[in-house]
Amino acid sequence: MPLDFTAIDFETANNSAASACSVGLVKVRGGRVVDTAYWLIKPPLGYDAFLEWNVRIHGIMQVDVADALLWSEQLPDLIAFAENDHMVAHNAGFDMGVIAAASAASFVPSPSYDYLCSLQVARKTYHLDSYRLPVAAMAAGFEDFTHHNALADAQACAAIIVHAAGRHGASDIAELAELTGSRMGHLGMAVAEVLR
């Protein structure tokens, strides 16, 4: 199989994983970026407060998402973009948790994805003082990006995976996970499980 995947990154309005306020997506085919997408999201009601700390990090304010579609309205676009790809994200547990929590808060089924964490892959690929996204991306040759912009972060994540696959001689995501000893995760919880 070729190195095909979708990299994803979310920014949130507050400390709830359900409060997605932006998403960046990067489609990779054969180790090359072939498409990108970015949009703002109006967080689900009850999860829509924008905390000052989060705004300082990503710069997105409540007024910015006033005309954005809700998670439930945008989830079909996310699914259509990602198709049946493996997903990758830096600290993937967070980003997959956003999908699950925002879906649960919106009373829509969470999509099902197998995923790989670029943070885990970076730890098995590079010898760095820190594995934060900007540092790991620099090791992969992806520099000077706007950290905490969801699209830029997804592009950095994609660059890490492509570079790491080259270093390890991996032809696809599953082989990269195996060669680095990184665990493939699976998203696909029922709504009730997320709300517990």
Name each region found by the language model.
Residues M1-A101, A105-S106, S110-S112, H127-S130, ...:
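Conserved non-catalytic scaffold segment of RNase H-like nuclease domains
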Residues F10-T12, S118, C157:
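Ser/Thr-centric signal marking residues that sit
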Residues P109-A122:
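Conserved beta-strand -> loop -> alpha-helix junction used to position metal-binding or nucleic-acid-contacting
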Residues N149-A164:
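Acidic, divalent-metal-coordinating active-site segment for phosphoryl/phosphodiester hydrolysis
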Residues I160-R196:
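Acidic two-metal-ion nuclease catalytic site recognized across multiple nuclease folds
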